[in-house]
């Protein structure tokens, strides 16, 4: 094994190359009891343009191998070969009737082949050996397979993931292809998806980046297994792969395991792809894109950017920061703050072979696109001429440094950087050099790249209202492909079972020792967590007032950040914060309003003084309210173009009736009438509420307490006690189906709501967790297998029992479920889901896997150091005095299938659910739909204000 020199950026990354050429990156981090494991393959959609092969292959990599997922591969292979031949015939056939006949033959062969399939065995084995969050993703340039796992199962993880890459088998092909259709339908219903696809096509043609990752509908209809196998043989070779581990493992122990398992992957070098040159724009090239949003106008300027490894990237990042930054002091930010534009932002992406830079401008409703473009060019010219101060330039470099340091400080974010770097063909040493180049940047570098890339050759894009046609995929008449051995185990599984495993108990949050908890004043709880990684602090002040109690907070969080004080304008305040390397954010959720301050501990005192002055002296400006009005107008128009948002609102109404947040929220009329002083008074009231503060940094507790008390005092009257509202669930006396018609969408979204009785004991609550896993959470759940895996009736499914906080355990509970399906499959999906709810099948063989899944979820979700105090505060707010996962795991280890069955019979079986359906109602058989309950056609004014 050849070893490269180790690198060190905040945390040590060791790079190795195995004898077969596979690259390994190892990062030991013992701060959390988990390991992130990933395999990155340098092959993406650009290597199979417009076919969707790279993406569909990613799906098939979950179906097992010659040893995993089968009871008899030799017998199964005979049928799989016949299926492959039929797909070749299908791709060569144009006659529609003959194509239907071939597909039915494939269906019959698939049903026979399923007699040998053990569905989801790979997922079950990953779970059995400490895994959670199993997933994958396909990009233009690469594909990544990843999950978290408990450290004691490193050997099993390596065995499974290397086996997966050596001998994959493309079983259950037909049903998974239908699932990919569902995924495509789901994407096509997203309001901007088709528009972005058209823009990518215009921008990148003739490069493969011009085509969608998922592929065209035409190519998806004509899949060739032979092409997929060729793709695998070409790109899934050792020199084209990287193994990434970050977390709680011992490198010396891990290396021999990795060498033994991953060195088995065949050697090889992928074929060099032909270089496709993207021509430069010639002058101001024009195009339009359709977006189904009336009222809103928009323009965009698209410039040629740089590929991922280009040395100009750091300077371009600073140039972009001069236009947009986290403090809202960029030149484009100011156009919005001053209400000259409704929206303006710069963004971009650097792929491996090309990049793009886009600047989007949204004029005010009464202004023109031409005026918006002129404003954008004026600000670009300022950057090109060097019209920015050294202070701003240095502050943006400091902002980049802060971002890099925080990205490296925990396993989750650091591992994503490792994946990105490897996928771009970089080493960790390259990353260090990038940081050094960024630190060494000069103002002249930024001016040079601004003039180089923001020139007269660009793509001018104008939005027009409209939709692109979508190709409806007809529901196939296939019979379900239901394997007979759903709970069997393979010989390979038995072999893994014989490996010795060290017993390691999960790690729980310790309320006493993990953080310091102080109560320095009435109504103030201060959590202090030491930061031993860098010198960046966060101070979060969470006030006990949320959107449920005070819906106007939604407006407040959009308005207050636009203001200044009597002595400091918005621009002066945020420029000073920017110079210090600090940021200020204001957010609201159901139960709290949170002020989050971030910066370097060296600037802690000055940052808090600035924020304190703002909080106590914020000054109303009614002119800024017009921004809220414009935003509300556009949001109202956009809302009913998104089936996901409409379904969420209708489901809220079904659960909470008049207390739905979509009915209590301020209406457009309310927004027009509200005064600035009203929101400022509300803000001043909110920051006097009981406060839970979270400091994470390097400063001593005494100093943090002193500055917090001095800067954020509630005044002589003290803090106002929390109200802690909780909404009551709506009950129904008979089954109903709430139906909302959206004719332009492909996918119908289905929600299920079933109000249930309270669960006052911990044992009942724990059983509800296990029931949820069994019924509707994860790839091995009943819903996933019966609805998606066997029948291809949905891309995404979920079902779970939802509980109020433990302190309110005497309140009612509810069962909820969700799926989205092609509109003409709605009744089929409902029938399967309804059957599961009313006649839940029992699989006692799954109980051990369920318990293991729960243990893994607890262990692998132990928080990063910056999030520990927030987790403890949430537990305490819910009524716990210790980490509740400790009691949960002790309890479920003793549970059996009988516990799940008793829970189901007592709390779910026999209850009539309420269904919510949002989508194309014209493609639903109303007579069959009525068998699920009284059909209620509902108008949007009933559930959306």
Annotated model-derived regions:
Residues 1-23, 250-292, 298, 333, ...:
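Proteolytic maturation boundary segments
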Residues 27, 32-47, 53-56, 70-163, ...:
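M16 family metallopeptidases and their MPP-like homologs
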Residues 60-72:
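Metal-associated gating/positioning segment near the N- to mid-region
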Residues 181-188:
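Carboxylate/His-rich catalytic cores and anion/metal-binding grooves
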